[in-house]
């Protein structure tokens, strides 16, 4: 059979497997590629091809991740799977692999375990919007009541971390049976096919960057005689059109101005779109009113804040991080988008110190406001050297 060409027309959705070690995340990942390729076409990937995940560097942090893809009739899925627990922590905090939804794999034989809980918590902290559950190894459980008990435990756990536990879809099956092409009692290929159909139905199509409200981090500011002030940067999302009002947010008080021109490679354009590097000409704005680290945004869509709770991964010594722990009162720089802002760290109750290689929840108070929203990623730096990575989990003020 001739290979089908890759259909760009289908919407693209990013997913990933999460859950406790040895509950079957990688087996399920392999089974997903196998079942989809048989039912709907595409490439099947063997277990070994996923398990020996290549290491990649994201913001100087070494993460082992496997990427596979599969297709349903209506979507193209890009799926990430990590070999070790530490890789999940780094992956989710740095946002190296942003997930539109996660597949929580939980062994029906063991029930929820410590990493099951930790991955659900991380998903909540870093803003993974949807979780679908695959209750794996169900062929090893003869007792129907035991299955129901495990299902209830998983639902409780999801509810504890503000996911809709009662309404979360749970598919019961065996990834191994599916991988071997078996389907005893509908636990194998049927269950995995049902999982994909559930992903299609339960995870909404993600909004594309271009459809979101305009935002551009300011990288540079120029004054052009006779024309005014130009700010440059890469449009993060949305579209800015000539004649539209924009806000300058962060560091100082928020101000409003109008975009009077957009240029790219010295050519004048009507608009700047997500992903493009552009210069935006601002009406009546003085060179000193704007600085790197602020953002240009559609009015009313983003606000400046100084105090927030974050989930942080501290680089290990091998990753070029600190060689020693830090304690409460630690004051590093927090690098948001294009600039560093000093901030004080408050550690959770009962945590005296944080070691390199740890992940920790901490409250940060910045000395200057930054345009932020939940889910914004940042780096922690000391004198220009990255020592940590984090994500804004909750904004306080």
Curated annotation (Swiss-Prot):
InterPro entries: EF-Tu_GTP-bd, EF-Tu_GTPase, EFTu-like_2, EFTU_2, G_TR_CS, P-loop_NTPase, Small_GTP-bd, T_Tr_GTP-bd_dom. Keywords: Cytoplasm, Elongation factor, GTP-binding, Hydrolase, Magnesium, Metal-binding, Nucleotide-binding, Protein biosynthesis. It catalyses: GTP + H2O = GDP + phosphate + H(+). The keyword Hydrolase applies. GO terms for molecular function: GTP binding; GTPase activity; guanosine tetraphosphate binding; translation elongation factor activity. Its main location: cytoplasm. Residues 10-207 form the tr-type G domain. Residues 81-84 are annotated as: G3. Monomer. HAMAP family: EF_Tu_B. GTP hydrolase that promotes the GTP-dependent binding of aminoacyl-tRNA to the A-site of ribosomes during protein biosynthesis. This is Elongation factor Tu.
